[in-house]
A protein has these predicted regions:
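Residue-level marker for buried hydrophobic side chains located in beta-strands
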Residues: 57-59, 101, 127, 200-202, ...
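Metal-dependent catalytic neighborhoods of phosphoester/phosphodiester hydrolases
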Residues: 111-120, 258-260
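Conserved beta-strand hairpin/beta-sheet module of binuclear metal-dependent hydrolase folds
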Residues: 3, 11-89, 189-205
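Cap/insert and terminal regions of metallo-dependent hydrolase folds
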Residues: 76-85, 191, 196-279
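Active-site metal-binding loops of divalent metal-dependent hydrolases
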Residues: 10-11, 61-64, 105, 132-133, ...
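Metallo-beta-lactamase
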Residues: 78-81, 86-92, 96-108, 123-179, ...
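Active-site glycine- and acidic-residue-rich loops that bind
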Residues: 106-110, 178-190
């Protein structure tokens, strides 16, 4: 079985450093993620294309372009990459995509899933998400309500292109559905099993960047930060034992790395690499 992994860049955006690192003091996180004069750090929106057999599977879709200029002005979009440009660079269009895995339905992950005309952007694709996350997004709590914009996903149900997946299920036989509940309920962190024996975990917002490997580096956005810490410790342990690669959706500088214990017996990112090396 031939499997190809390709990074799909959809542009960058800025978020408050304190929001991205929670209670961790700025003196610690600013060394790794320098902030500007407004305390904003620049973040990638890096999706992943998995080609296996006749299937072309896109994991997440970026922020899209449906919202108002005022909305986007809060996030200082930058960079010359876009979803369409990145697909075109590898000779594809949205119509070539057969599956879309939505790790969760926050706007920076699902914005590209639906067009400005509120139709499914990937007209021939099935969209995979957990039912837990779907129900959570459609009945949001006050803390997350601003991140769940129904115009980004509501039409997927009306068009009949949704597929609810369960933990442990496999998509195209190689993408294992792992779920986490600390950041938001029912978030998928897909684990890709390559024919070579290598495994790649798409970190979503459990590991938005390599700086978030440490269990106490938890975003203020997370609805259950203590749960995130527990989930991350367990994932760090398994990733180390099984020698996984971690793919970072929001890390501006690094696509992926391994996780290992350092001399202080703490988990940290090591052996940074590009996903191309796995093809």
């Amino acid at each position: 079985m031939n499997v190809k992994l390709t990074t799909i860049h959809t542009g960058n955006f800025k978020l408050d450093g304190g929001a991205m690192f929670g209670v961790v003091p700025k003196v610690l996180w600013n060394k790794m993620n320098p902030s500007d004069e407004n305390n904003l750090c620049n973040w990638a929106m890096r999706c992943l294309l998995v080609e296996v057999g006749s299937r072309k599977i896109l994991i997440d879709t970026g922020i899209g372009d449906k919202q108002s200029d005022k909305f986007f002005s809060h996030y200082y979009l930058n960079g010359d990459q876009s979803l369409d440009k990145s697909l075109a660079y590898v000779g594809l269009t949205k119509d070539d995509i057969t599956d879309v895995i939505l790790t969760h339905l926050h706007f920076d992950h699902v914005g590209g899933a639906v067009t400005n005309e509120l139709t499914a952007a990937f007209s021939k694709a099935i969209y995979h998400v957990t039912e837990t996350q779907w129900n959570h997004a459609n009945n949001p709590n006050p803390r997350e309500k601003a991140s769940f914009l129904k115009e980004n996903f509501e039409t997927l149900q009306y068009e009949g292109v949704l597929n609810f997946v369960e933990p442990g299920e496999k998509i195209a036989d190689i993408i294992e559905v792992l779920t986490c509940n600390g950041h938001t309920l029912g978030m998928i962190t897909p684990l890709i099993h390559l024919p070579s024996g290598e495994k790649v975990l798409y970190g979503a917002d459990l590991y938005p960047s390599h700086s978030h490997i440490k269990s106490n580096f938890v975003m203020a956005y997370d609805i259950q930060p203590l749960v995130t810490m527990i989930e991350k410790e367990a994932m760090n342990q398994r990733a180390t034992e099984e020698n996984w690669w971690i793919y970072y959706e929001h890390d501006l500088a690094h696509e992926m790395s391994k996780i290992a214990l350092n001399e202080k017996n703490q988990f940290e990112a090591m052996n940074f690499a590009s996903v191309d090396m796995l093809n």
